Regions:
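Small-residue-enriched, tightly packed secondary-structure blocks
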Residues: 1-139
Length: 139
């Protein structure tokens, strides 16, 4: 995850997702996510720890690119999620998902203990390895 700060893009903070659900599903798929935190409150809320959402999901994927339509039970969309799926999958389900910080991955990448809020606010300097990603995102 990466955040836009007043001074440009932050360094990346590593995250993991997990969850469970119930419904009728068949097939297998791999999904890549881009998570957009739309405001400072969303960045701060995520930086403090994992967040849980409960939603209804109707999905279909076939071949190299699929589409997923998901609706979360949230009053305001402070977070947008874009996804790209590969595989063969169809299903309807009620799901819960958790997105959390991978503290050990952040430790390994930054060379020591660092908090997600320090990374995403730009307080922690981005390592040189993050430069290509930050350049690709633009100013």
């Amino acid at each position: 995850m990466i955040a836009r700060t007043p001074r440009g893009w932050s360094g990346p903070s590593f995250v993991a997702t997990g969850g469970g659900g119930w419904g009728l599903q068949a097939g297998a798929q791999v999904t890549d996510f881009v998570i957009v935190l739309n405001n400072d409150a969303a960045v701060q809320a995520f930086s403090r720890g994992g967040n849980m959402t409960i939603g209804v999901d109707l999905s279909a994927a076939a071949g190299p690119v699929g589409r997923t339509a998901a609706g979360a039970v949230m009053p305001i969309a402070a977070v947008y999620t874009y996804s790209r799926s590969k595989g063969l999958f169809v299903g309807v389900s009620l799901e819960g998902a958790v997105i959390g910080t991978q503290r050990q991955s952040n430790f390994n990448y930054y060379g020591g203990p660092v908090r997600a809020d320090s990374i995403l606010s730009g307080v922690t300097k981005a390592p040189p390895g993050a430069a290509p990603l930050r350049r690709a995102l633009g100013p």
